[in-house]
Amino acid sequence: MGTVSLGKIAFTYKGSYAGASTYFRQDVVSFNGDSYVCLVDNTVGVAPLNNPTKWQLFAQGTAGVTSAAGELVYNSGGALAALAPGAAGQVLTIGANGLPVWGTPDVRSGTKFKRLLENASTKVNNRPYRRFGGIMTDNSVRMWGNNDNYVLGDGNTFARPYPVRVAFGPGFAGAAKVYVDYNYSGYCIDLNGQLWSWGYNGYGQLGLNDTTDRRVPVNASLIASSSIFGKTVTEVIVAGGVEGYCSVMVLCADGTLHSAGYNGYGQLGLGDTTQRNQFVQVPVVSNVAAARLGRERYTAAYAVQADGKLYSWGYNGDGQLGDGTTTQANIPVQRTGGTLSGKSISNVYCGHTAAYALDNTGRLHAWGTNTTYGNLGCGNFANQFTPVQVAIGVADVYTNSYDYPMVLIRKTDGTLWGAGAGNYSANGNVAGNHAADFAQIPIGNTVTKAAIGGTGSYNYCLALLQNGTVYAWGYNGNGALGVGDSTNRTTPVLVPIALRSVQDIAVYGTSSEQCSAFLFDDGQLCVAGYGGSYANTDNNGNWIGTPYPVIL
């Protein structure tokens, strides 16, 4: 027994209620899980429950309220009540009646990334200048960093240290794919297959039938005189490099190819060198399965048809059209020379002054300028203006966007190989020598993707493995390797991401002003590298040496 004294009032705890016992005022007993205080002396044989003249509830327990494991007890306003356990993944929230209920987690619109800019893919040989972004879980688009020429699409030119929502207008169905070129224009294919464009438009590359810049996205698919009017857009092809004079191509679901913008070297494929301010269908080619553009201004264009035929046109000063000459072509011409003879082509890739074609047997063919760097990987440093076979068992090809050309190839066995410019050992040559032969990068045989960053000799590489880990090597003066410092690496090192899993990687920036992006499988995006114009989202513009979360 115990006595609780509250000044002039003393309660004596008598334990569990017993019907034969005599109780006096201030005696406390437990009964059916609750506690009661006796109100009348000499109370015998009167149970506490429902006898308010003899007993008063002293402290309510949970007996009669809850009986199942995992139930939660709450005050319903007049009594205690039990809430059954929720299901896995549910969270406790407040219902419309003000009482606790189980519900689905309330994820705020756009709080997670689900897809990076298409510049992260091998389809776009381009590295955006001090800016990046992606598509969110609500299908909106967020971007940050340098905002020259309204490229962030938020209506002004202020650099942003945090992701801002691109200001699409009425009729926008949500983003499917987003592209930006080096420093001028942005493009988005919406979920309905319509094309939106914004930014600088001095060459008519926005496809809006004028040369007026756009501060926010405009629907180019609604231009009735445009060749993409009424069509479903599936891909946008932007040029690489840093030279301006912008051209763009658009691939539609029906296999037609369309072009707009600068045309000084016939890169629009329309039979002349006249600029186009709206999209015009490219003649000759049909049922196009893949298309690419080379460098800005001095642009070569390529298309692969579903039947395996390869076409090229445009600038040819470096022999990148693959016809054995350096003469430009203003209209698409099928290429069957050299080792392409009799081959069915499945994909095409291009670099600064060279091109690569993958045939349906996994053989890789290359052509273009090769002196100094050996970027064709053909075993020598001689130019090859007609295609030569350079590798077998190839699954994918990765090139850098401008000078000091190098190339990585991922083979069907999951290994990664490098050739070309050896600056900072990005090509895999530890001594930093240029290499005309492909050499294996020592990171095993589970590579799923690679990327090459930097221009002006500041090359570096990332490689994503099947288990979600990332290796990095090459130039690291601003921490873009994400390994915690600014020391260059001549051999691949593991990026410290603890036990987390990366599902996609990207590189952006030019020269030594580079950044890397790491998209995790939970939708979080982290970046490392250069901080100018808030390229890495750092408010103070400092470089960041380890992957740092992008704060929304």
Describe each PLM feature range.
Residues 1-17:
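Short, intrinsically disordered N-terminal pre-domain segments
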Residues 3, 21-33, 49, 53-107:
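Extracellular repetitive beta-rich solenoid segments
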Residues 26, 45, 68-70, 88-89, ...:
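Glycine-centered loop/turn motifs
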Residues 26-29, 38, 72-73, 92, ...:
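Extracellular/surface recognition and adhesion modules
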Residues 31-42, 414, 523:
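Disulfide-stabilized extracellular beta-strand modules
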Residues 40-48, 536-537:
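Short, surface-exposed beta-strand/turn "edge" patches of beta-sheet domains
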Residues 105-552:
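Eukaryote-biased RCC1-like beta-propeller repeat architecture
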